[in-house]
Amino acid sequence: MDIGLQMVFTGYGWKEISDQQVWDEELKIAEIAADSGFDCLWAVEHHFRDYAFCPDNLQLMAYLTAKHPEIDVGTAAVILPWQDPLRVAEKASALDQLSNGRLRLGVGRGLARREFDGFRTTMAESRERFDEAAAMIMESLRSGWMESEGPHYIQPKVEIRPRPRFPIDGRIYAVASSEDSVVSAAKLRARMVMFADRPWPKRLPQIQQHAQLFEEMHGVPGPPPLTADFCVCTSTMDGAEEFSREYMGTFVYSNFEHYELLGDHFSKVKGYDSYAAKIEVAKEVGIEGIIDGFMQAAVWGTPDRILREFEKRRAIIGDFELATSFRFGGTPYEVAEKSIKLFAKEVLPVLKSWKEPEAKQAAE
């Protein structure tokens, strides 16, 4: 099984924490992951607010690939409607050169109105821009050339330099939290990325849809998804549920605040109507109900309990890759460090013994 670290770069939930401390703590945890046998370092792209602030994950990965030469690096994800497709392709190709093919390129379309406003763009165009830009980028990393006649991106034919050296297929990831994003991921030949934020039986239809579409479009089995997780690993169960709920609950609150999830704007924006329906459900169950669902999806407690939860997940959704975060929702650094070290000692070796999915090999 492939296990990565998810780097969130969040300051929400801590009192009087500086941006420097946020970054220092994330980089320390990344070093532990790299030294402990994790397979990949993943980083988000977010801007402007305490929720998360990693404005250029490709730039970050250029640093991490030099500092940690034995581990893959990944973007989860580059938000394409805020980018120029040519610049993304060039930076990805350059990073692949520096890392000798260790880049995993994850892409997404964005959800926070505040971030779209900051980049002087509109959520209403995000689906079209994502689909157009993603196709341009992936094709250019296959062929070495980029050209497009729009409608959103008019790009004269240019060569990608440094020329792509390594096949990109098998290393493409796409965030898929809505039904149309599942279709887009399948078209891209991308592994689907989904967050551990609701009970896994509710995720199964999307996973099955992606697998079916992938095989119909490309003639090979679709790769298992990457689940982006949140973890609190403890030596005993004494108090584990209480403080796990504290940190995970704070992270849930940060999502509601950052994404304005109780607002009515999703129903008015093209391409986000599926979120409006989910928000109505959220209003019915309330914030505590949402936290309950998050706690069911994420993993917490002793290594034995965490392994049992992963086994239950695999029984529901099948094989999956993992990218888990240990620092979120006000988690003190000492707690996050103990958590990842115990996870690396007791959980990681067992997960790595799980057989690698045949679908992954076929996709590559």
Features from the language model and the residues they span:
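Internal, glycine-rich beta/alpha segment that forms the wall or movable "lid"
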Residues: 1, 84-190, 201-219, 362
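N-terminal beta1-alpha1-beta2 module of alpha/beta enzyme domains
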Residues: 1-73, 168-170, 361-364
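Hydrophobic faces of well-ordered beta-strands that scaffold small-molecule active sites
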Residues: 3-7, 41-43, 73-76, 103-107, ...
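An alpha-helical appendage that flanks or caps ligand/catalytic pockets
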Residues: 5-7, 35, 124-161, 201-319, ...
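Active-site mouth loops of central-metabolism enzymes
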Residues: 9-24, 78-86, 166-176, 294-303
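Short, acidic/polar
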Residues: 20-32, 176-183, 305-312
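Conserved, mostly hydrophobic/aromatic
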Residues: 37, 45, 64, 95, ...
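Glycine-rich, proline-tolerant flexible connector loops at the mouths of alpha/beta enzymes
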Residues: 40-61, 79, 197-200, 325-336
